[in-house]
Amino acid sequence: MTDANHLLDPSGALPQTRPPWTSRDSLRITRVRAIVTAPEGQPLVVVRVDTSDDGLYGLGCATFTQRYAAVAAAVDEHVGPLAVGRHPADIEDITRLIHYSSYWRSGPVLNNALSGLDQALWDIAGKRAGMPVYELLGGRSRSAVEVYSHAAGGTIEATLDQAEELLAEGYRNVRLQLGGPGLGTYGAPGTLGGYPRSPHPDGWAVEQYLRDAPRLFAAARERLGDSVNLMHDVHSRLTPKQAVVLARALEPYRLSFLEDVIAPELYDRLPEVRAASPVPIAVGEQIGSVPDAVRLVRDGGVDLLRLHTSAVGGLTPTRKIVALCELLGVRTAFHSPADVSPVGVAANLAVDISTPAFGYQESHTYNDATHEVFPGTRVVREGHLYPAEEPGWGIEIDERAAAKFPPVKFLHERWSSGVRRPDGGLEAP
């Protein structure tokens, strides 16, 4: 075993973890830690970065709900120690160093841990400048961010009832989902025993789905009219050919986008799917690295990029990816349901409000407990979100309140583990 002690400086740090330049002031990162809370049942991971300036701290979203404990451990054991002692203004150098330091890089666990630090440093930067973060990114490109919400039911009528409620609240953009045999959706249960003569009677059949989805949107246009923008999430369960079949069947109903039509393992086929689809293709929430996002945009695989921004490493890489979108005519539609913390929403909004590539923003209505844990949580008004005008993200965390909602054994993995066909075979989630 090689003795590397001769490489260490007196503080115990490897020399390359400390920059060869002198900071213009004595401000330093003093502590980095993960905070896990679940005010709506889904674990949210937020990173807090404290500094030597008493009261100056930042928050960042590191939420990977299905592996929250792994992310929290990565923050506390690996990411944080490499940042302590650094000047919080050195965001690019700190995040690149930590990205390189694992040698095997990227992936949703390490990228979410890095995102928590990265976003927290941007929060600190905004507070030091006395500016909201979007002003650090170039300022406004629009007054507010237009959002979409979800309508889902076990029947077409139930789904459209929810859609009408959203329209009454001021939404112009609604994603429609329908439960069915073997598969529920967003709080709407699926039906059991749909295939009683099959080896797995409670299964889900793609053929039935391909018949039901066009019926849903035909009924939606008839009942909701033409003024509402409609979307749909496939959840990665189709082959490339099936994706094209569905897109063509939905063409008469003028969807704003069709989401996650194929599994990430098949993303090399997206350019051909998009070329054959009359409906805009929105993909990206399952991307876990910057190179994967770049390939989607560069190679013509998407019309709208749906990043889960913490899964690619935070604001720093996201703004670079979005710059590429601006140059290549791809629009954004960031992932942001209940498994994105209010801090993550604030980071999304900073990009949304400042980029000319903005398309849509997914939204979620947080419960009262989440507002208690995260003072400053943004609220949808007439189908729009407005960024905070306070310095940084404009979001705080009440750690006493957060402690009232510890994570428990999380059942979200039931759907994310996939569904089974009537023959018992496993399909993607």
UniProtKB/Swiss-Prot annotation:
SMART domains named among the record's database cross-references: MR_MLE (SM00922)
Disulfide bonds: none
Residues covered by region (Disordered): 1-22
Keywords on record: Magnesium, Metal-binding
Organism superkingdom: Bacteria
Function summary: Has no detectable activity with D-mannonate and with a panel of 70 other acid sugars (in vitro), in spite of the conservation of the residues that are expected to be important for catalytic activity and cofactor binding. May have evolved a divergent function.
Protein known as: D-galactonate dehydratase family member Caci_4410
